[in-house]
A protein has these predicted regions:
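Surface-exposed binding/hinge segments that line
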Residues: 1-41
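Append "and occasionally in soluble cytosolic enzymes with long acidic Gly/Pro-rich linkers
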Residues: 149-246
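Gly/Pro-rich hinge or "lid" segments in bacterial periplasmic/extracellular proteins
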Residues: 24-82, 86, 200, 205
């Protein structure tokens, strides 16, 4: 929205588009590349629901919500002649049905191939695993109603989880998590110190120093109360979280999995409804770190559902919002990441890759 990107007015002067903001906005240009923003001809909106007039190499000729988008090459596209005269995009949400469509050659290219269906395309197909900027993480409840309010508890849990195992369960080129932004974001991943690594002995040491001890049931307890956490999850595939549940139970922490109906419930869950909650987020949807940091880690931000708050992080996010030099922006993001890792602000499980499978006749995807 205009409010989100701090736009006061937009005017046109010949070939110049003049955007006036309400305050300095270092991420303005990046924000305008967000896929949710489009340039649309608003002169005639009678067919906007089925044939909107937009920009780009292809024009929409037909649209059926939840089914298909028919595209035709735009002859006057500034980038020159296109490789295809037309493209049909089919909306197939089910993983198995999508895989079957490619097997039967009803479609030529599919994305979002899960590890269970990957083996179907070993022969006679092209498979590409593309490192993305998405992070699958567990948002932490930092409020006093949760045992994870204690940094020792969240740090111990972060050391118990087997990140290599997490990446293998998801498969398709996924890599183990350890920081807010993946290495592919080019925001100093390798330079971040104290990233969580699997070390159950270290977890035991941390909990022991915090006053926890194992009881007769082999579970950690303090002041007569066993350490137990609730993980709220919403995805269809629960195998990843069942693995975490078993890992924590084996180490001495009881886990209850709380199934949500959709990711939309996360924002309205309330801090009394979880200790950890599943989030799957594109960290650099605009190729800039501001959106992710401000939305998930600024004190009081909507997606900061766990109530994380650190004045240093808030100050860095504020600084990021008014900084225009790209190198400076990257350095600020690196500083914020280091604090988030040191605080165990959240637990970063893995970085999924985008998997694209096509028939052999398709080139240059």
């Amino acid at each position: 929205s205009a409010k989100a990107v701090k736009i006061e007015s937009i005017t046109v002067d010949g070939q110049n588009l003049i955007i006036k903001t309400t305050e300095p906005n270092g991420s303005l240009l990046s924000s305008l590349t967000e896929p949710a923003f489009v340039i649309m001809d608003t002169a005639d909106l009678k067919d906007v629901a089925s044939k909107p007039v937009l920009t780009g190499p292809y024009k929409i000729t037909a649209f059926k919500k939840g089914e298909t988008i028919e595209l035709a090459a735009f002859a006057d596209y500034w980038g020159g002649k296109l490789g295809l005269d037309s493209v049909t995009v089919k909306d197939i949400e089910d993983n198995n049905k999508r895989a079957m469509a490619l097997q039967s050659k009803d479609v030529d290219v599919i994305q979002k191939v899960d590890s269970a269906n990957r083996s179907l395309f070993k022969d006679g197909f092209n498979i590409q695993d593309i490192a993305g900027v998405r992070v699958l993480m567990l948002k932490v409840n930092h409020t006093e109603v949760s045992p994870l309010h204690d940094k020792a508890v969240r740090s111990a849990i972060a050391h118990i989880i087997n990140y290599d195992s997490m990446a293998k369960i998801i498969g398709n080129g996924s890599t183990p998590g350890a920081a807010p932004f993946p290495p592919s974001a080019n925001l100093g991943y390798d330079a971040i110190a104290n990233k969580a690594m699997t070390d159950v002995a270290k977890a035991d040491q941390i909990l022991t120093q915090a006053g926890y001890a194992k009881n007769a049931n082999g579970m950690y307890a303090k002041d007569g109360k066993e350490l137990a956490v609730t993980i709220a999850i919403w995805g269809k595939d629960t195998s990843l979280y069942e693995e975490i549940q078993q890992e924590l139970k084996k180490a001495g922490i009881a886990v209850t999995l709380k199934k949500l109906q959709s990711p939309d419930e996360v924002d309205t869950l309330g801090t009394d409804g979880f200790d950890l909650v599943e989030r799957n987020v594109v960290t650099m949807s605009t190729n800039d770190p501001y959106w992710f940091l401000s939305l998930f880690y600024k004190t009081g931000a909507k997606a900061n559902v766990g109530g994380y708050s650190n004045p240093q992080v808030d100050a860095l996010i504020d600084q990021l919002s008014v900084t225009f030099d790209q190198n400076e922006r990257s350095n600020i993001a690196k500083q914020a990441q280091q604090i988030l890792v040191d605080d165990v602000a959240d637990i970063y499980l893995l970085y999924p890759s985008a998997t694209v499978v096509s028939t052999t006749k398709v080139k240059n995807v």
